[in-house]
């Protein structure tokens, strides 16, 4: 049996891994293979293993800032641990570098030029024979880890591991992440805590926004808090960005829709009314259409695994709930549920070393 071991300090990626592995469990073909274990690792951030104790791959994940810091303080030498592990186990080594693709080479990241980071990445590939994989954010890193895991579990057969169609949750996270400063982790918390409709209708008071925390129990960045409060007060520019995150709605179309009215106005209207909005084009005027209108209502009212239906009669009159802020993502309670309450988890024969040297107990299985 194959399994992926994640270091318990990988707080920002583990929530996405749990979701991605849960989806693998739904596939009968992969049901007995999708196993995630969370332990303390001493080499790398992730290990792809085969029972009982064979290490197949070791993966280290760093953001650009982490990479730059490691170049400055010497932690870049941690690669020696990975090289030593490969010498003992003959495992493959992977280095994930997380962040926006292809910044300006002269751009300073943690006081280190991006060109220097590129040079270090090249050395990892040419000198140390490590696979370097660039990822966009935490969610993308999780997807790449699952793809690697699936490839190893299928003995490197090149197949598509899962459906390329994103889930509603992934689309909603992408919607929140369309706002500057909101990462995939924060977007996931917001997607499972409140809907856009809750925010723009005043159901998420500023004092509750101030209590929101990351999976590591840290407060949201001040910039994000100010932005959420600004949206709740009707900031048109931010509303356009949010609306543009809905599938098949770009920035131009979002700006045209919100040209004369605030986002709350459309959330108060029936879907049929929204579908009849006239959109001016270069040579003609067209209607928004039912499919786009339904997508807007669906994703702006999406919260957790539930689609929240907003009653146009009471969206602005509903009692403001007292939100219960959780410090762990698994305990996060969707805001609409809180509102309702307020109102009514030995060595291998091939010579690979055992895992006991690379991790400690405290296993979490998904």
UniProtKB/Swiss-Prot annotation:
One BP annotation, GO: double-strand break repair via break-induced replication
Residues forming the ERCC4 domain are: 3-101
Q: Which GO terms describe its cellular component?
A: Holliday junction resolvase complex
Report keywords, A-Z.
Host-virus interaction, Hydrolase, Inhibition of host innate immune response by virus, Inhibition of host interferon signaling pathway by virus, Interferon antiviral system evasion, Late protein, Viral immunoevasion
The protein's matches in PANTHER family, at most eight in alphabetical order, are given as: CLASS II CROSSOVER JUNCTION ENDONUCLEASE MUS81, CROSSOVER JUNCTION ENDONUCLEASE MUS81
The name this protein carries in UniProt is ERCC4 domain-containing protein EP364R
EC number of this enzyme: 3.1.4.-
Question: Which residue intervals make up region (Disordered)?
Answer: 320-366
Induction / repression: Expressed in the late phase of the viral replicative cycle.
Q: What is the lineage of its organism?
A: Viruses, Varidnaviria, Bamfordvirae, Nucleocytoviricota, Pokkesviricetes
Q: What does this protein do?
A: Plays a role in the inhibition of type I interferon signaling pathway. Mechanistically, specifically interacts with 2',3'-cGAMP and cleaves it via its phosphodiesterase activity. In turn, prevents 2',3'-cGAMP interaction with host ER-resident STING1 leading to inhibition of downstream signaling pathway and type I interferon production.
Q: Which family does it belong to?
A: Belongs to the asfivirus EP364R family.
Q: Which InterPro entries match?
A: ERCC4_domain, Mus81, Restrct_endonuc-II-like
**Where exactly are the transmembrane stretches of this chain?**
none
Enumerate the GO terms in the molecular function aspect.
Answer: 3'-flap endonuclease activity; crossover junction DNA endonuclease activity; DNA binding
Domain of life of the organism in this record? Viruses
Start-end of Polar residues biased regions: 320-331, 349-366
Name the species this protein comes from: African swine fever virus (isolate Warthog/Namibia/Wart80/1980)
One Pfam family, short name please?
A: ERCC4
